[in-house]
Design a protein with these regions (language model features):
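Helix-adjacent hinge/juxtasegments
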Residues: 59-89
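A short, acidic/glycine-rich surface segment
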Residues: 35, 66-73, 112, 116, ...
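Core segments of cupin and vicinal oxygen chelate
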Residues: 13-66
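N-terminal beta-strand motif that seeds the catalytic metal site of vicinal oxygen chelate
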Residues: 1-22, 40, 83-86, 90, ...
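Vicinal oxygen chelate
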Residues: 1-4, 99-143
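Exposed loop/turn and edge beta-strand positions of beta-sandwich/beta-sheet ligand-binding modules
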Residues: 43-45, 84, 123
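Short, conserved charged micro-motifs
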Residues: 20, 93-98
Length: 143
């Protein structure tokens, strides 16, 4: 792989309460919150959390979906729900730590899957969980 190709910049997740969602992603998933103070002060429309140095998850309130029609007609009716899940690839240690944190916070997780195909080939292990707003995530590791 080269560094000059397309990269995933961000994914917008529809959430009921952006501050609560940021708390979930920080405390339970272990992601760094961004722009929380600016959101609380009304300076930005939504906060985000950092997935890695190149990718963030935007935590947009549900009521913003109505505004999607002005940008792309018909988008408000489907915004967010055609997505099946988002997969996050981690090291084996981070994978195990995430599963432990989720369980400690009472978040249901699926049994392990083995050998599921993804961007880097077949994963050693993977599992699924959902956030408080119903967004589904897969966690996996290849090492």
């Amino acid at each position: 792989m080269t560094n000059s190709g397309p990269r995933l910049d961000h994914v917008v997740l529809w959430v009921r309460d952006p501050v609560a969602a940021a708390g979930f992603y920080e405390k339970t998933v272990g992601l760094e919150p961004l722009r929380l103070d600016e959101f609380a002060a009304g300076k930005v429309s939504f906060p985000s959390v950092r997935l890695n140095e190149e990718t963030i998850l935007d935590l947009a309130p549900y009521d913003m979906a109505r505004g999607m029609n002005s940008m792309l007609p018909g988008a408000a009716d489907s915004a967010g729900h055609p997505v099946n899940h988002i997969c996050v690839s981690l090291s084996a240690a981070a994978f195990d730590a995430l599963r432990t944190r989720l369980q400690e916070h009472g978040v249901p997780v699926t049994d392990f899957s083995h050998g599921a195909y993804g961007a880097r080939g077949n994963a050693k292990r993977s599992f699924y969980f959902h956030d408080p707003d119903g967004n589904v995530f897969e966690a996996r590791h290849y090492d």
